C-alpha cells in the first residue's frame, strides 16, 4: 500500500488529504506533481524509520524532479539516511551531489564536517596524527563554509573551530 494511504491517525490523514488537494491545484506539470508525491512519501517513510522505502521513493522523485533546489533537498535527505546507516562514503558523495544542485545548504556542509571530524578522532585514537590533522582540517573547511552560510546557527561548530585553532577571523563577519 502506498505510504500516502497508510495513515493511522487523524492528523496524518488530514494532512495527507490537504497536501494531495494542494498538489492537484498547483500550477505545475504532472511530472513535477508526481515527483513531489514521491518526495513526500519518502519523507513519511523516513520519519517512520523505514529507510529502505524512503530511499526508493527518493530515487523515484529524483527521476522525475527537474528543479535543482528540490533535487538538492531530496539528495540531502538520502545522505542523512546513508549517514544514519553508517555508509559515510556514500553520505559524503550524496551531500556533495546535493551541494552541486544547490550550494546554499549549510546542513549538508555541517554533516560532512561531522563525518570528517569523527574520522579524525578515530585516526587520532589509532595514533595516526598526520591523518587525523588532515581530516580535522577538512572538517574545518566545510564547517567554515557552513558557518558563513548560517552565521550563529552552529555555535558548537564555531566553538570547535576556535578551540582547535582552525578558525578564520573572517568566518564570523
Swiss-Prot record:
It holds the Pfam family TPR_12. This is Photosystem I assembly protein Ycf3. NCBIfam families: PRK02603.1. It comes from the Bacteria. The keyword Membrane applies. The gene is ycf3. Belongs to the Ycf3 family. One of its GO terms (cellular component) is plasma membrane-derived thylakoid membrane. It is found in: Cellular thylakoid membrane. Keywords: Membrane, Photosynthesis, Repeat, Thylakoid, TPR repeat. It is a peripheral membrane protein. Essential for the assembly of the photosystem I (PSI) complex. May act as a chaperone-like factor to guide the assembly of the PSI subunits. TPR repeats lie at residues 35-68, 72-105, 120-153. It comes from Prochlorococcus marinus (strain MIT 9303). GO terms for biological process: photosynthesis.
Amino acid at each position: 500500500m502506498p505510504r500516502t494511504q497508510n495513515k493511522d491517525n487523524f492528523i496524518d490523514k488530514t494532512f495527507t488529504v490537504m497536501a494531495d488537494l494542494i498538489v492537484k491545484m498547483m500550477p505545475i506539470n504532472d511530472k513535477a506533481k508526481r515527483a513531489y508525491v514521491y518526495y513526500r512519501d519518502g519523507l513519511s517513510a523516513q520519519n517512520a524509520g523505514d529507510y529502505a522505502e524512503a530511499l526508493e521513493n527518493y530515487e523515484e522523485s529524483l527521476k522525475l524532479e527537474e528543479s535543482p533546489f528540490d533535487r538538492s533537498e531530496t539528495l540531502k535527505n538520502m545522505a542523512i539516511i546513508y549517514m544514519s546507516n553508517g555508509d559515510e562514503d556514500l553520505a559524503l558523495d550524496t551531500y556533495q551531489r546535493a551541494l552541486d544542485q544547490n550550494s546554499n545548504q549549510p546542513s549538508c556542509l555541517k554533516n560532512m564536517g561531522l563525518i570528517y571530524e569523527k574520522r579524525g578522532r578515530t585516526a587520532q585514537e589509532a595514533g595516526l596524527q598526520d591523518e587525523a590533522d588532515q581530516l580535522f582540517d577538512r572538517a574545518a573547511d566545510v564547517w567554515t563554509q557552513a558557518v558563513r552560510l548560517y552565521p550563529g546557527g552552529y555555535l558548537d561548530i564555531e566553538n570547535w573551530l576556535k578551540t582547535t585553532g582552525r578558525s578564520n577571523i573572517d568566518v564570523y563577519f
